[in-house]
Every structure is written in structure tokens, then in C-alpha cells.
Amino acid sequence: MRITALGTGMPNQTRAAVSISFLVELGNGDKFLFDMGSGSMANLFSIRPDFSRLDKVFASHLHIDHVGDFMGLHIGGWLSGRYTPIHIYGPTGSTPELGTKSFVEGMSKAWAWDLATRSGALPDKGAQIVVHEFDYKQLNEVVYQKNG
């Protein structure tokens, strides 16, 4: 297992400390991204991971320093060889509009033009986002389980 800190800073980032993100790579080739704060995707793209295997993202919560680069990851990963849907695992909100599903719907609307202009040039499945919400009020909830 290899863990790479792509960012460890706060929302008021600097060149040396962008917002939080961790890439976890397993020996079987699986890759997981935990948070994707603003600025962290530049560090991810600089190490040139195999984007075809980077399709699982876990958002601890929806502050900008934890999800600010989600759409950059989504669209950039699609452009870099991830031709399958991206899966985001994130919290519900105290109301539906404060949860991960609503966040993704809002971001998808905001970036609709960008996504539409790339459609047809790349496999459409890569443009899809699958949302998996977990109940933020639950303790010790399993949010992902595969291969054990």
C-alpha cells in the first residue's frame, strides 16, 4: 500500500500547502482518493497516476478545502483515460440540499457546458458520476467494501 499526501493545507492555501487530499494505492492496482481539496489536483496530475483505475473518491465532508477540485478530477480524469463512471462516496446532509447528491447535481449543472462540448469525443461513460451517500450521523458505518 502506498499513501501519497497531495495536499495537507486549509482553504487559505499557498503554493507549498494546497488543500487536503490523499491518494491510496493498493498492490492489486486499486486506487482511492480521499478528499480532493482546492489545488490538490495539480499535485495529482503531476505524478501521472493511471486514471483508468482512479474511479473511487471519498469525501469526508463538503467544505471547499475537501471537495473544491472534484470537478477538475472528474473532467481531467476523463480526459486522461478514465472511461468509466467516477464514484463519489460522501455524506448526507442535515437536509437533502446539503448532501453529496445535491453537491454533485449542482456541480454537474455548473459544468454542463464543459461536459457537453467534450461529449462524443470521449466515451460517454467517463462523464458519468455515481453518488453513494452515507449517513453523516452514523458512527463506524462501512461506506465501501470490496475484496474483503
Report the location of each language-model feature:
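Binuclear metal-dependent hydrolase catalytic cores
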Residues: 1-148
